[in-house]
């Protein structure tokens, strides 16, 4: 059954309708079924329930409805009209007769997450962001998904906050932000992680390996892989994309790729494939569009990313791209957030101070030293914001860094850099903070 479970009158401002879109051969041009909550009825055409009979339910609060199977190629959509933009908790009751599976959840036409449905029947919950006015929530069967029957759902305004970490490469989210990630998760809030590139400069087969390493590292910190967005662009090309006078020009990355990809073996497809049905090209038009759609759809309360003051071009221009998107959404759509910028690759190669251990092999936990002059980009070390990590949080950060085998130990075409990576196991993390 498909039921909107608004069991009290708190959400009178929310009006929902729903329509199922199946392949044309299945519906034979029929009008899409309408779920009219205002009228207190649910109606479904035969292309939905494979029957010529319409199913009606005049008592939605009684827990009745229409079962809707979401199979390959299908989509279930619900329109909404709300008076105030906010994060909402969507609870979804389902029946999954197969193995553990997923379905794509879309908000206003853009991919939000893959919802996990364990084998059997039950209820799962996701936190989404709905904008003021009219919009649409959809469940779509995506690559890697399973056949799931949706039974009912309900929406409640959420008290959770959403933080987003935008990382140029797989490991930057841990080196710079593992402490903030842990504190956010411990507070019961949500962390989304956006991976701009696949970190595949040294080896064209390295991308999926690094994606899996990040997945394991984030799992150590309590972040589920469903909260990872793999943009899947080429390593060391963000500057070229950002500075190109023609945003439509397609670049070949050093890896040899010219279009986005993810790791299908982990059910982590690239964002553009999930969102639009095909990979994006390595051009700034697609890169900017993907980044804009992710941030605009999620509307995180806080965004963490790397610094314009770094020597690494992906970090420097990744920051510029994130800042540009936030400024545009703030100006054009009234989006408000806090942007936190931190440093991974300082100008001085001796920074950060390497990790030291005592005679028993236990790490000595010390604070970061100021890494370098800010490269003429106006970063004042007297105005930096610091957070303090507990011993347990530092040890978890160390364990998360352990997961990056390629970056710590190297590969056939490159050396590892474990000394640099573990040097980020410090008592503090630091940011320059901008409020929009």
What are these regions (language model features)?
Residues 2-15:
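Bacterial N-terminal signal peptides that target proteins for export
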Residues 15-23:
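Bacterial N-terminal signal peptides
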Residues 24-34:
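Sec-dependent signal peptide cleavage junction
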Residues 32-158:
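Extracytoplasmic
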Residues 156-297, 320-345, 381-383, 400-403, ...:
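Active-site rim/loop-helix segments in enzyme catalytic domains that contact anionic ligands
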Residues 291-310, 315:
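Proline-aspartate-enriched helix->loop->beta-strand connector
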Residues 323, 390-394, 398-436:
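C-terminal regulatory/interaction regions
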Residues 352-407:
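A conserved mid-domain beta-alpha-beta active-site/ligand-binding segment of alpha/beta enzyme cores
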């Amino acid at each position: 059954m498909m039921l909107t479970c608004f069991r009290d009158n708190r959400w009178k401002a929310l009006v929902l309708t729903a329509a199922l879109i199946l392949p044309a051969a299945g519906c034979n041009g029929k009008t899409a079924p309408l779920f009219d909550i205002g009228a207190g009825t649910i109606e479904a055409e035969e292309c939905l329930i494979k029957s010529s009979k319409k199913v009606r339910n005049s008592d939605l609060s009684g827990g009745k409805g229409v079962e809707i199977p979401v199979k390959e190629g299908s989509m279930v959509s619900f329109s909404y009209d709300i008076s105030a933009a906010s994060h909402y908790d969507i609870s979804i009751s389902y029946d999954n007769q197969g193995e553990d599976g997923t379905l794509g959840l879309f908000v206003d036409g853009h991919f939000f997450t893959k919802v996990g449905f364990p084998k059997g029947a039950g209820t799962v919950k996701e936190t989404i962001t709905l904008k003021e006015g009219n919009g649409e929530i959809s469940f779509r069967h995506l690559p890697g998904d399973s056949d799931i029957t949706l039974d009912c759902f309900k929406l409640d305004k959420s008290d959770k906050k959403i933080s987003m970490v935008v990382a140029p490469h797989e490991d930057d989210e841990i080196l710079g932000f593992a402490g903030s990630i842990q504190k956010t998760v411990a507070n019961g809030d949500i962390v989304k992680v956006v991976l701009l590139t696949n970190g595949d400069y040294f080896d064209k087969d390295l991308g999926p390996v690094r994606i899996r390493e990040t997945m394991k590292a984030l799992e150590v910190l309590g972040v589920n892989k469903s909260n990872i967005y793999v943009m899947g662009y080429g390593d060391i090309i963000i500057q070229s994309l950002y500075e190109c006078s023609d945003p439509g020009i397609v670049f070949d990355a050093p890896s040899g790729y010219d279009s986005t990809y993810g790791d299908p073996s982990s059910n982590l497809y690239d964002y553009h494939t999930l969102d639009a049905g095909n990979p994006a090209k390595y051009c700034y038009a697609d890169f900017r569009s993907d980044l804009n759609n992710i941030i605009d759809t999620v509307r995180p309360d806080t965004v963490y990313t790397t610094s314009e003051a770094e020597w690494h071009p992906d970090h420097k221009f990744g920051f510029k791209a994130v800042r540009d998107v936030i400024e545009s959404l703030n100006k054009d759509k009234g989006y408000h957030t806090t942007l936190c910028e931190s440093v991974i690759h300082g100008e001085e190669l001796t920074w950060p101070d390497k990790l030291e251990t005592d005679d028993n092999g236990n790490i000595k936990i010390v604070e970061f030293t100021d890494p370098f002059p800010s490269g003429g980009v106006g970063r004042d070390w007297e105005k930096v914001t610091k957070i303090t990590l507990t011993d347990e949080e530092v040890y978890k950060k160390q364990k998360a860094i352990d997961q990056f085998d390629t970056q710590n130990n190297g590969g056939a075409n490159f050396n590892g850099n474990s000394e640099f990576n573990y040097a980020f196991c410090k008592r503090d993390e630091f940011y320059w903070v901008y409020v929009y």
